[in-house]
Amino acid sequence: MDVRKTYKLYVGGEFVRSESGRAYRPEGSVNVPRGSRKDLRDAVRAARSALGGWSARTAMNRGQILYRAAEMLDGRRSQFVEVLGGGRASGREVEQAVEALVWYAGWTDKLAQVAGNTNPVAGPYFNFTIPEPTGVVGIVAPEEPALAGLVRRIAPALCGGNTVVVLVPESHPLPGLTLAEVLATSDLPGGVVNVLAGYRKELLPWLASHMDVNAIDVAGCTPQEVASIEKAAADNVKRVVKHRADEMSPQLITAFMEMKTVWHPIGV
């Protein structure tokens, strides 16, 4: 007997239905939960609660967890190929997603040395700069590539110690919702990644204007949506990150980080 899969939102480490009970059908006969403003609020609250513990973990431990996520994703390769539509292109996309997780896992314990610095200053001071996480990051996932593009947005934010709230593509949400199942079994603490599905016109304005979101990645947005996000983000000086969905770079990690400079007197 075939058992039809039930897709749910992923909030605070738990798989939940939308509080409104609504659903929509973006891909054939599959029902997808239609997230609401309250679901978004709960996701941001969960991300904020998880931020302290996740950012306090050692860089090596964060790298181990990202690598574990890559292992779990690779182990479910056939499922993701099916969700993506099948064929060689889908197989290559899954491989790209695995490679992205492994690549960013390797950067976790190198970030402080590469992005940080000891600064020469005039005077009896020891001056140094260290990177710190921005905080809660909102991610608007790109339509294509649905899986690899999403992983390339999540991984750099997690690498730097941030927590994230993801809006999966409205018309192609299944890869993102299935990725949440991988993350739930990858030793990732609850609330570090929260995945929402639903109508973008309902969720995006609240994500952009939420005062407890510190940055937002707009890789999956149209130019018109980016303009409205930038306007809404100005209220709490929210960082707006614009990078291509297929891009992988250490600069993507630092885009979600604050550089803290410390002055320490010496010779006193």
What are these regions (language model features)?
Residues K110-V268:
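Rossmann-like NAD(P) dinucleotide-binding subdomain of oxidoreductase/dehydrogenase enzymes
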Residues M1-G85, V241, S249, E258-V268:
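Short, structured beta/alpha segment
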Residues R34, E95, G198:
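Conserved phosphate-coordination/catalytic loops
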Residues V11-G13, E19, A105, A141, ...:
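Pocket-edge structural micro-motifs
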Residues A46, R68, V83, A100-W103, ...:
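Alpha-helical scaffold segments in soluble metabolic enzymes
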Residues W54-I154:
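N-terminal Rossmann NAD(P)-binding subdomain characteristic of aldehyde/semialdehyde dehydrogenases
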